Regions:
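Anaerobic metallocofactor- and corrinoid-dependent redox/one-carbon enzyme cores
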Residues: 1-257
Length: 257
């Protein structure tokens, strides 16, 4: 239904208002949202038999976060042009702790979206994805999540926001690290174990700096194939956003060569 509505109204990105509007009257839509954000997803057909958005994701912004929706669409199209994996998502910026061990010695954030991430972000794609019933405390009518542990690799992170009636964007580079299963379980159980998790390291931005500057509880993330490309793609994305009239702020360690 969501994909058919997007086709009918000519939408390039959509959000479903189940938080807070629909959560008390219908099941949560996270499983659908995670699938729609994945390029390789089950096909959807129009009533006349056309396959809708064939071979592409339909970027979806969780909780109808319109700034995240704008970021999702721009990032998906730009990364596709750059030959990079275009699947992207927002996450809740929850909490973090310094972790030492297993090749990691850094402050590692808990990025946790409230229900669904694209399977392309998981280590083994769909094979490592699962679906849990949404916690009744948040979603009394249930609904399935799209859950997994995000794979290690370089990322570009960002946040588009409105300040002084002008669109701004903070962006930088980071890394997803691989933590041991017991540490992943500890972090999951300290937050919401039904939801997908990403172990995020934000390069050059401390915990206190992030908490002081970041303008939302959401952070947007997308992978690149290597670290050098992450820095280059971050710069290209900043240029694209600036050309659209968005005020850009580089945050942390972004290389300019």
């Amino acid at each position: 239904a969501a994909v058919r509505m997007a086709d009918a109204y000519g939408c390039a990105t959509i959000g479903i208002q189940y938080q807070q509007g629909l959560k008390d009257i219908c099941a949560a839509s996270d499983l659908v949202e995670g699938l729609l954000n994945n390029t390789h997803r089950p096909p959807v057909y129009a009533s006349d038999g056309r396959e809708l958005f064939a071979g592409k994701a339909l970027p979806h912004f969780n909780e109808v976060d319109e700034c995240a929706g704008l970021d999702a669409l721009i990032t998906y199209e730009l990364w596709s042009q750059l030959g990079q994996p275009p699947e992207n998502t927002l996450h809740d910026l929850r909490w973090g702790q310094h972790y030492s061990g297993a090749g990691v010695d850094d402050f590692v954030w808990v990025f946790l979206i409230s229900g669904a991430a694209p399977p392309a972000h998981f280590a083994d794609g769909y094979k490592s994805a699962s679906s849990d019933r949404q916690p009744a405390m948040f979603f009394p009518k249930g609904g399935g999540t799209l859950k997994g542990v995000s794979k290690p690799g370089p990322i570009v992170w960002s946040r588009i926001y409105l300040e002084g009636n002008v669109l701004h964007a903070d962006l930088g580079v980071g890394e997803v690290v691989d933590l041991p299963a017991e540490e992943t379980a500890r972090r999951w159980n300290g937050t919401t174990p039904e939801w997908p998790i990403m172990h995020g390291v934000i390069k050059g931005v401390s915990r206190d700096q992030m908490m002081a500057k970041h303008k939302a509880n959401h952070i947007h993330v997308v992978y690149t194939t290597d670290e050098t490309t992450a820095h280059k793609a971050c710069r290209i994305k900043a240029a694209a956003l600036a050309q659209l009239g968005i005020v850009v702020n580089f945050c942390g360690d972004v290389r300019f060569k």
